[in-house]
C-alpha cells in the first residue's frame, strides 16, 4: 500500500513492472511497510513474480503493522551479495538495533497475528467512516485499499494544499498534511491519517466540516 493514497498494485501490474526490470536488467527496492494493512484481497509483492526474487531488495519493519513506531526496527531481504554489502555499511554505521527492540519484534512475529488482525479491522472501520464523511462534504476521495490514510481533493476550494492545511491548523487547530509534501502532483489534495481513535477522528472531522462550511 502506498503513502499517501493507500493505493495498491495488483499482481498483474507488478508483472508489467517486472517485464521492464528484467528487460533492462534493473533491481527493485520494494518498501512493503504497510503490507499487513491491506483491506481488500491479498497483498501482492513483486518478489512473487518469476525472475524478480533475485533482483529485489524488500524492505519492511514493525512500525506500522505492529504499532511499534518508537522502536525503530526494520529489516531487508534480497540477493545474498547485496545484503552482504549492506551489512558492511550497517554494522559500522549503526552496529545493531537495541536488543530490547529485537526481543519485542520476536514476540510480535510469534504471537502478534491476532492483534494485527484486530487492528486492521479497526482501521477499516475508521477508513469507512472518513470516506463517508468526506463524501458528505463533497471532497472527492480515492478509496484507499491499504495503509491508514485518505487523500481527499480540495480543488473546489480554489486554494493550494499548503494554504488549506495551514488555515485548518490555525482556525480549527487540526493538523493534516498538504499533498505537495509528497511531490508536485499532490497539489489539490491533503492527507488525513486515521491512525487515531474513532473519538478523535469524529472530533477532527467535525472541525474540518466547520472549516469547509466557512469557505462556502
Descriptions of predicted regions:
Residues 1-216:
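PLP-dependent class I/II
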Amino acid at each position: 500500500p502506498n503513502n499517501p493514497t493507500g493505493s495498491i498494485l495488483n499482481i498483474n501490474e507488478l508483472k508489467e513492472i517486472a517485464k521492464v526490470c528484467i528487460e533492462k536488467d534493473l533491481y527493485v527496492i520494494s518498501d512493503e511497510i504497510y503490507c499487513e494493512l491491506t483491506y481488500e484481497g491479498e497483498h501482492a509483492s513483486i518478489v512473487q513474480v518469476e525472475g524478480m526474487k533475485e533482483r529485489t531488495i524488500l524492505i519492511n519493519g514493525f512500525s506500522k503493522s505492529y504499532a511499534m513506531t518508537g522502536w525503530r526496527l526494520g529489516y531487508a531481504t534480497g540477493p545474498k551479495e547485496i545484503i552482504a554489502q549492506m551489512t558492511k555499511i550497517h554494522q559500522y554505521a549503526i552496529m545493531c538495533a537495541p536488543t530490547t527492540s529485537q526481543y519485542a519484534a520476536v514476540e510480535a512475529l510469534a504471537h502478534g497475528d491476532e492483534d494485527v488482525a484486530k487492528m486492521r479491522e479497526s482501521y477499516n472501520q475508521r477508513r469507512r467512516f472518513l470516506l463517508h464523511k468526506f463524501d458528505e462534504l463533497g471532497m472527492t476521495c480515492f478509496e484507499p485499499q491499504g495503509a491508514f490514510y485518505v487523500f481527499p481533493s480540495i480543488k473546489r476550494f480554489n486554494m493550494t494544499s499548503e494554504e488549506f492545511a495551514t488555515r485548518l491548523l490555525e482556525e480549527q487547530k487540526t493538523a493534516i498534511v498538504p499533498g505537495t509534501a509528497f511531490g508536485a502532483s499532490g497539489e489539490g489534495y491533503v492527507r488525513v491519517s486515521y491512525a487515531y481513535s474513532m473519538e478523535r477522528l469524529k472530533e477532527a472531522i467535525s472541525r474540518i466540516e466547520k472549516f469547509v462550511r466557512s469557505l462556502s
